[in-house]
């Protein structure tokens, strides 16, 4: 997910769906202050919420997931992930420890679905580099990346991680790739998809303003 974009540029049976949101507890706030948030970020930690939702993993098993988003989208994010769960759409990893650590808890494959990370937007692979000088929607908690390995940021024949390369051809449907039903679920809450961009495509990326 967001971790991957810091890399060098390279050529179930379903029951009741429950979800909840809550402010960040003090230990998590402290952890973020030493990593993914700093003074000068466009939102405060008090603006953020943990949204807890069930998801279906790549083995078809129900898991309990968490994602940090801005409080003004917590309800709609909860709604969209309930829809993904009902669709049985597979998500590789979606727990706070997967995204924010500690380091020993971060999955080796880094194929983590997540939202908040106070950082710049990442330039197109056509341009290269890791920072654009402009805040990403992730810095506001207004964007979500879904299964980043299976849904690459792609442009000019380039990706940011070689593990993404097998998923560039979207005509070859593979597990974890964003489907039309997933796009419709996000559109139902007013979010746009990076797969609709002209030129460079960001297949993992959904956001409130479509950017």
Across the structure, where does each feature detected by a protein language model lie?
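Bacterial N-terminal signal peptides
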Residues: 4-12
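N-terminal module-boundary/linker segments of secreted carbohydrate-active enzymes
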Residues: 14-61
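Intrinsically disordered, low-complexity boundary segments flanking structured domains
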Residues: 34-42, 98-104, 130-135, 178
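Active-site acidic/histidine clusters and adjacent loop/turn architecture
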Residues: 43-111
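Structured segments of extracytoplasmic/periplasmic soluble domains
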Residues: 56, 79-90, 119, 149-152, ...
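Conserved short secondary-structure elements within globular domains
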Residues: 92, 99-133, 185-192
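Catalytic cores and adjacent binding grooves of peptidoglycan-active enzymes
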Residues: 123, 128-211
């Amino acid at each position: 997910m967001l971790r991957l974009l810091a890399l060098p540029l390279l050529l179930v049976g379903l029951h009741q769906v429950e979800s909840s949101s809550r402010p960040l507890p003090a230990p998590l706030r402290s952890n973020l202050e030493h990593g993914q948030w700093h003074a000068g970020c466009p939102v405060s930690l008090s603006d953020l919420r943990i949204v807890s939702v069930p998801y279906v993993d790549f083995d078809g098993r129900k898991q309990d997931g968490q994602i940090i988003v801005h409080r003004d989208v917590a309800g709609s994010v909860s709604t969209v992930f309930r829809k993904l769960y009902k669709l049985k759409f597979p998500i590789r990893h979606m727990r706070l420890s997967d995204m924010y650590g500690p380091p020993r808890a971060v999955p080796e494959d880094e194929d983590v679905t997540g939202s908040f990370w106070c950082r710049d937007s990442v330039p197109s692979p056509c341009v290269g580099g890791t920072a654009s000088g402009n805040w990403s929607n992730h810095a506001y908690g207004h964007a979500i990346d879904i299964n980043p390995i299976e849904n690459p940021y792609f442009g000019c024949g380039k990706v940011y991680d070689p593990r993404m390369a097998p998923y560039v051809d979207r005509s070859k449907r593979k597990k974890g790739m964003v489907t039309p039903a997933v796009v419709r679920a996000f559109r139902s809450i007013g979010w746009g998809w990076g797969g609709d961009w002209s030129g460079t495509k960001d297949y993992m990326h959904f956001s409130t303003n479509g950017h």
